[in-house]
Amino acid sequence: MRQWMWFLTTCGAPLALAAQASDSGAFVLTLGKDTIALERYVRSGDQLVDDMLLRNGASVTLRHYVATLNPDASISRVELDTRPTGASDPPLLHGVATFKPDEVFFETTRNGNRQVAHVAVSTGVLPFFNYSYAMYEVIGRRAHALGGNPVKVVVIPFAAATPEDLTVTFPKPDSMGVAFENDAPTRFKVDGAGRIWGVDGRQSTQKVIATRLASVDLAAAQATFANRPLGTLSPLDSLHVTIAGATIAIEYSRPAMRGRTIFGGAVVPWDHVWRTGANFATRLTTSDDLVMGGQTIPKGSYTVWTLPAPAGWKLILNRQTKAPCEAAACALPTRAWLWGTDYAADSDLARVDLKVEPLPRPVERFTIAVEPRGNGGVLQLEWETTRASIPFVKK
């Protein structure tokens, strides 16, 4: 935390609860001990100007957008620039989105290549920028304008092909929850004017915490973090082994501890089904039938889940490997892999006990291994100071 405190200006007391014509603020976003982004915004009249420094990639990037606000808390136009750090660097992406009653028109230039797209949408759809809490304030105001609790707010990521639904709730006058489909909500501390004063996403997929400040010096932040990207926060990994004549492949994402308590904490709570990784559901494919925990696992592909608990862990193999679909969409070759929040117990193939033991030293990044043992092998999951494992044999 000390690495960025010197270029932050701390916020004062909350502003008046009545809506303001003009407002400004900043957010510092952290994932465990790591600062992953900083945001600064100014809202004046019908214009929202937002600047953000993002570290969650191969390089540190700067994102700038200007949105034109409507009286009903919808948006009519957004212009976006994303560029690497360094004032002379050209934009990686420049784009303009124009919002009409039944469509969004995107004009984008990426690495010199211009593209245009028309996307059919419902009236009042909002743009969505990951980690932009200034835009979450707009989402909250839009939810109030629509009325209801909960209320659905439709958003579309910049240049995306399809919109997405957010569920917005107001549990108390000073709180708001925002959730994507099948995900736990990010929780916000808000005031009567819709300003966000605190963000707790530890129960959601992203796990991010954000703190509001009066301002942030992005130039100083850029100098501090320019050569210190965090890379992909939970990088994709895979393994491919042959044991006792059976070929086993596993694809999964690898979250890191980042100074957090993992098991029994907010990252992996006890007695909740865990995606056993991050992002998309972990997938296991076997070329031959296996026997695991006394149960036969037919050859094929499965998603891998776990149910950690203080008294013991369960390994869950599930038949569902692709995203939920309807009718003809289920046959499309472009159908996405299953996201890690879309677990469906009615598709379980097997639930078996895992052996759980402590590790002599912490494992920073979640790791899956398959190793030979006896006349078969063992599947091992390691993270923090815990190893969970189960032996198997080829049938």
PLM regions and their residue ranges:
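Short, exposed beta-strand-loop hairpins at the edges of beta-sheets
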Residues: F188-K189, I196-Q203, V378-W383
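Extended, well-structured beta-strand/loop surface patches
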Residues: P229, E251-K299, W305-K395
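Positively charged n-region of N-terminal signal peptides that target proteins for export
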Residues: M1-W4
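Short acidic, Pro/Gly- and aromatic-enriched capping/linker segments at domain boundaries
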Residues: D23-A26, A223-T242, G277-L290
